[in-house]
């Protein structure tokens, strides 16, 4: 064995490549070994350093791959054992054990996390060269007993199913020990680069290779200063020193110092020396030179999105200077936090990249389909799960519009559960759903699912066959092929499909002869799919590489950007969580030779120093270290390592927000520039100098010219929220000449509430989602129907009998039966409505001096100027003197307010009066009023009553009164009825003024509607808060930003309020 060390300013790879070339020139076969995470980059680097740029004598690979070169022909043809297969084996083993067999873990038998921990422990035992019987000295002896039962049973299953229990390295080591590879190894030289420690498995293999190979050469970075130190605790080279010292002591070799021809920039060397001096308690009498600062940059950004954008702009600048994407490396401090954002931003700047991390399959449509299938079976056909299956695009041949219509209907009819899905859809609504088509679609969905879900407990092989038959019926494979939109997606789908078929094969192999329920089968497949990962190799090598910063090696790329280096992630604190604690692992390690657990938490300090050292030397030309103060909406501090660099004299540059400028980095990429122009066009203008304004004026003029060629535009507006008028063609279609504009009191109220809301409801005809479950609209229909029946009953039956008959016959109507007898909740609503009817009905019995002459009266009121107002009057009453009035039933409290009416928000009563005036017989000229009747079950606070007497009854009937607007002429006739006339009496002239102003409101609204320009103007009564419908989800209206667009209501003081509003009405309606 030969041990080599060198300073960070030299290239260890070049030194080891020279050693490899010498061995190859002598006729030896050379294996150049790199860590798993670095083998791809190391292979490219080694080939670059070879003069011939390639050779068959030097193979750059990993330990695992190297073993296959020697054992591929002699290895037994057994089944491959991966993590998913292991999990299934442990699940089967736990199925065969009873809870009482496992005192410590009996309650966790079906816990997926526990099974994952078993898989991790089993893999650790293999890497550590340990068996489950070596787990002595645990905190609880029962833990070892349980683990022995579980793992031994799992290993028995592996033997029965012919799975290979040995790892590739174990098989390689066994072959070496048996002397099967002596001839080949005698002509082999092994060169090892990039390691600072070996696992127990690698350590044991290394000892065998050292005894049988021609030579083993290992290199590591250690400074000569550190190598000569006797005390190395806390030294930045502590990990490498321990690594070399352990090998030197074990193999009785003295490491040698070597140098390379290639010497990197002295700026990095000087920074490394300062970093070393800080941690080995020595001092230096010099500082970084001014020229050294050109190779380092420390950035601080406010948010991670801005941080990534700054990096993207800098990369574009490097390309402008002539560098390639492959010259750039981006390192992430927090892979999970940055992974989702860095892709879209790099795509915006058109930067091709390769993310050096396996992607989880959990977000793939196939996994979502399997998960929805499993949940549909487990939760008895829940609607959300069925719809998720359809939306995955993998179930059957349904268009998106068909799925949307199916979803809309199932939500309306509340279809959920197998019973409802299995029955034909018969319920319809005013929207007239295409039931024939929906039932055909229902059958195409239900029949294959029903055939699969009715499977009883049976052999696993039979379940897999039925599942495959189901997947064929729904054309899963064909739909999977149709998902891909690009070559990259094709490759991803192929990897996911291969993983899916492997999982099915493993399940068939392990559970083929075991009896299982379908739910267990689907749960196991779902778990395997969700935990699986896949990789896609980039189509070209000229890409920006992105990976975690702790996987970096020295001198990786000319330009390195390390971002997200906060205190929480740099350094990383690794804590193991599993079935064994670190203390238990340490006790086991004390008594084993060549066999030991890796305890990551025990090596945090020296590993972090080693990572920081590699990071500070990762670039050969320029290193950018960046930190964001906010990551995932959480504030974080600077890394202590970055604080050390600041003490060395490196300035911390606050990059700030990404304001637009005319630097090359801002305008050098068309796609990024366009996105920023759009962004700035949507926000308030920032302050600019005259030079900036001139520059952007010219740029915008040029950009608009280019956009016009592509029929695109950048809209400009004086307000944050604005709307466009409808085109003449649309106006002619929506409001054709010669055809009256149809309005109603409700439509007029919506218009004056918010014009844009009128546009949505009455021009676009957008409706809210319907539901078969009773809502306020259906409750109102029920109450109206009961009172309509009651008032039509002119028999001599007692009033209470009439009321009972009205309730009974209304409940028997098919529509109300369908609505109120569907479930217990609907039945409870019906009971409440019946109580309301019984509580409100007595008011009708008390008013014996009125006669109901009509109910549910449809009308059409001609307002002139091609305006037709339509509606339904709930009830028309006639007093004893022949005067007429209208009653409008309300399920909530309402009363006429002249100010609300003036502002157009309460035109209903006056509209009904105008209609009644038009349809009333010619011999009846007098109207006594228009009123609301609140249908309610009055609630009284008994604490306010001193005793139970007539005052209690009076309070109940006081709540049951007619409230509205009444004629002063009819005051005497109204005084004997349940009419609340206080502050509600108007003279005939005043009533005429109200009617004329009501007509004016309609004419004014119609004129504006026919122009086709609808404003976003919800009303405000005080100028501080907005009471109108803001429609935030559609308009993005924000009261604090858009108060200027709200319509301010006219409000007057309570004193003389009536007279003042009447005066305003006369002026505006030209009276």
Curated annotation (Swiss-Prot):
GO terms for biological process: double-strand break repair via homologous recombination. Heterodimer of AddA and RexB. Despite having helicase-like domains, this subunit does not have helicase activity. Belongs to the helicase family. AddB/RexB type 2 subfamily. This is ATP-dependent helicase/deoxyribonuclease subunit B. The gene is rexB. SUPFAM superfamilies: P-loop containing nucleoside triphosphate hydrolases, Restriction endonuclease-like. The heterodimer acts as both an ATP-dependent DNA helicase and an ATP-dependent, dual-direction single-stranded exonuclease. Recognizes the chi site generating a DNA molecule suitable for the initiation of homologous recombination. This subunit has 5' -> 3' nuclease activity but not helicase activity. GO terms for molecular function: 5'-3' exonuclease activity; ATP binding; double-stranded DNA binding; helicase activity; hydrolase activity, acting on acid anhydrides. The keyword Nucleotide-binding applies. It is an enzyme of class 3 (hydrolase). Gene3D superfamilies: 3.90.320.10, P-loop containing nucleotide triphosphate hydrolases (3.40.50.300). Its EC number is 3.1.-.-. Its cofactor is Mg(2+). PANTHER family: RECBCD ENZYME SUBUNIT RECC (PTHR30591:SF1).
